[in-house]
């Protein structure tokens, strides 16, 4: 098995294919949160802020595209900005720290680079990110949470950044929300946010992903298959009974009666 980027996943699959070795790939993501106008706005903003800042956004299944129904777009954005501004950045073992550094200097430059590329390509800066300074941690690879908005064709909306950056866009109705959520090369995880459970089930069933959540995100339940489709992997189950089947093979033995 391999967990990592789609680019390296292709190389692993190619090498395994040359020797007919089965391989399971769990690759990147560009998850969407589809947020309807009957949602509890403060609660949704809080949970999605937690999702995007958990592990400093270095989670392949997190929601990095926030699709908000137009009728509540401004209210949701304001709530999300206020919530993200309150995130305490600091040493991972520090008291009160809610978000630590990214994993390396390379990743630090990658996150900042995508913010620059996104704005250069026309994205609106809703919440300015950038490097963060933490007292007593000079040289640490800290970044601030950031929100961009605009066309979903923007590079920051299409490519995996792997940092605390979300991209905002609005939609009019249910069908458009589903279409925008699925309009990506990735297929790891999406979520739907609404007080209407029937709508949530209907929308989630149309996600082109291996995983979906209702009024939550990044909640992993052991025993439930976890995997991606499209550019996010080759399906199958992780942390579930299906995982054990990777270590078994079937053999048919037939005898005359």
Task: For each feature predicted by the language model, list its residue ranges.
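N-terminal Rossmann-like NAD(P) cofactor-binding module of classical short-chain dehydrogenase/reductase
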Residues: 1
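ALDH superfamily catalytic-core signature
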Residues: 4-152, 214
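Conserved C-terminal structural/oligomerization subdomain of aldehyde/semialdehyde dehydrogenase
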Residues: 34, 88, 138-257
């Amino acid at each position: 098995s391999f967990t990592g980027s789609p680019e390296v996943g292709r190389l692993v699959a190619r090498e395994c294919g040359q020797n007919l070795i089965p391989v399971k790939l769990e690759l990147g993501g560009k998850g969407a949160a589809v947020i309807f106008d009957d949602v509890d706005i403060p609660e949704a903003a809080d949970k999605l802020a937690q999702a995007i800042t958990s592990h400093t956004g270095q989670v392949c299944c997190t929601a990095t595209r926030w699709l908000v129904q137009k009728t509540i777009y401004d209210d949701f954005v304001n709530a999300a900005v206020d919530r993200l501004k309150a995130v305490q950045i600091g040493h991972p073992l520090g008291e009160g720290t809610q978000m630590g550094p990214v994993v390396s200097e390379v990743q630090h430059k990658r996150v900042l680079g995508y913010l620059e590329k996104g704005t250069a390509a026309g994205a609106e800066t809703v919440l300015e990110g950038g490097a963060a300074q933490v007292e007593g941690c000079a040289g640490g690879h800290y970044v601030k949470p950031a929100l961009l908005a605009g066309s979903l064709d923007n590079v920051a909306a299409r490519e995996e950044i792997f940092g605390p950056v979300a991209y905002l866009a609005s939609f009019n109705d249910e069908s458009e929300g589903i279409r925008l959520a699925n309009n990506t090369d990735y297929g790891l995880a999406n979520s739907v946010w609404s007080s209407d459970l029937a709508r949530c089930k209907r929308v989630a069933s149309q996600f082109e992903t291996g995983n979906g959540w209702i009024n939550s995100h990044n909640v992993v339940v052991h025993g439930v298959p976890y995997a991606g489709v499209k550019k996010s992997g080759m399906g199958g189950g992780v942390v579930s009974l299906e995982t054990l089947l990777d270590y078994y093979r079937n053999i048919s033995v037939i005898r005359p009666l």
